[in-house]
Amino acid sequence: MPNNQLSNATISNTINMSAWQGRTDPEDGELGMRWHQKVLPADQANEEGIMLLGFACDAGVARNKGRTGAYGAPIAIRRALANLAWHHQEPVYDGGDISCDDGNLELAQHRLGEDVCLALRQKHKVIVFGGGHEMAWGTFQGIGAYLLQKQEATESIKAPLNLSEEKTAEPNVKGTAIPTPRVGIINFDAHFDLRNPPSGPQASAGSSGTPFHQIARFCELQHWPFNYACLGLNRGSNTQALYEKADRLGVLYRDDTELTHRTIEQTQAALNTFIAECDYLYLTIDLDVFPACVAPGVSAPAARGVSLEIIEQLMEPILTAKTEQGDSKLLVADLAEYNPRFDIDNQTARLAARLTWTIARAIR
C-alpha cells in the first residue's frame, strides 16, 4: 500500500485495563494472586517481561469469505485469562489493541508490526491476541523489522528501513558477512494460508488466507530462508494447488490425521530438527486446528481437528528451545481466528486463555 494511503487511514490503538477483573483471595496473600491482579499497562513496563498485544480485526476474514466476528476476540481472551491463577516469574504487560475499524487491513497490519517491533526492541517476549489470521503478516512485519534493525546496527548502516524493497547483502565494516537470520515459523492450523492475493502473487493486499505467502515473499526479497512448518492441516480444506505450493517452498507439514498418539514421535523428531536449524521462532496458533467440540468459536470450525493434548506435546520443544546464549528462541506467539460470536459458554475463550497461560509460563 502506498505510504499516503497508510497515513490517511484511521486505526485506533488503545489500552483498556477494564477486562482485567476477577476473583480475589486476600487471605492467601501474594500466593493467591491471579492474572487480573498482576498484569500492568505497558506504560508501567520498567523491566523485561511479556507484552500482550491485541489485533481487533476480521477484515482479512471477510476478504477470504469467512465468518466474521473475530474483531471481538482480544477483549474476550483477556477476560477469560484474567481469573487464571498466577504461577509466573516474569512481569506481564498489556500493550493494548490495534483496532481495524474501517477495513484498512494493510494499515492495521503495519501498525501491529510497529508494536511488535517496539516490544522486541524493549527486550520483551510478545503474545498477540487475534483477530483473523491476517494478523500473522502484521506480526511478522514486526519480527522482520526488529531483525533487520539488528542486522543494520551490526553493520553500522543507518539507512532508513523499507520492508517493501529488496535488501542487497552487504558486509559489515570489517568486511565480514553478517549471518542471515533464520526465523522458524510454526503454525498449528487446519489451513496453509499460503494463497496468492487476489490481485496477484506480488500484490500487497491480502486476506486471512494469504499471510504466509506474504511472509514468503518478504523472505525472498530479503534473501532470507523461508522456514515454515504447518501442523494440523485438514486436507479437505486445502486444494492440491496449495499442497504443491507448499512442496515448492519446502514447507514442513502434517495433516490432522497424522497427528495422533501413534505417530507423534515421528512428527516430534521432524519438528526438533526444524527448530534446531532456526535462530528464532515465531509460533502462531489458529484455533480452528482444534475440533469444533473443543473450539466452536472460530471462523472455520473443524470437523476433526487435533486434540489439545497432542498440540501441547508439540508445543513443548518450541517453548523450551534455547539459543547458544541460553535465551528463548521464541520471539512472538499469537492466537488467531477466535470468534466470540460463535462461541459456546466462552469455551474457546478459555482454550485461548489456557494456551496463553502455558506459553507465558514457559518462554522465560
From Swiss-Prot:
Q: What is this protein called?
A: Formimidoylglutamase
Q: Which family does the record assign?
A: Belongs to the arginase family.
- Transmembrane region positions? none
* Name of the coding gene: hutG
Matches recorded under CDD domains: Formimidoylglutamase
- Record's SUPFAM superfamilies? Arginase/deacetylase (SSF52768)
**How does the cofactor bind to this protein, according to its record?**
Binds 2 manganese ions per subunit.
Matches recorded under Gene3D superfamilies: Ureohydrolase domain
Which GO biological-process labels does this protein carry? L-histidine catabolic process to glutamate and formamide; L-histidine catabolic process to glutamate and formate; putrescine biosynthetic process from arginine, via agmatine
- What is the annotated signal peptide range for this record? none
